[in-house]
Amino acid sequence: MISYDKLWVTMEEKGINYYQLTTKYGVSKSLLSRMKKGNWVSTHSLNMLCNILDCNLEDIATFTKDEQ
């Protein structure tokens, strides 16, 4: 399972809020909603967020192996 909980922490650390991502940087509200729910997002979107936040992927996402 991929979790994007670290995204919100990184945003705070970088001084960028939800409103700025959507208005200044053009990140769609639906993308942020999908991430908040833990749903699928494209690698393009992850790359875009890493560039905006000037961070690495591990700063916005974590992988946890699903229990079988």
Where are these regions (language model features)?
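A short, Lys/Arg-rich alpha-helix, primarily the initiator
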Residues: 1-20
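Short alpha-helical DNA-recognition segment
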Residues: 15-33
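Short, basic-rich loop-to-helix N-cap that marks the start of a DNA-contacting helix
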Residues: 38-51
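The DNA-recognition helices of helix-turn-helix-type DNA-binding domains
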Residues: 28, 39, 64-67
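Short, charged recognition helix plus adjacent turn
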Residues: 9-13, 34, 61-68
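Residue-level recognition of specific faces of alpha-helices
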Residues: 31-34, 45, 59
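Alpha-helical residues within the helix-turn-helix
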Residues: 12, 23, 51
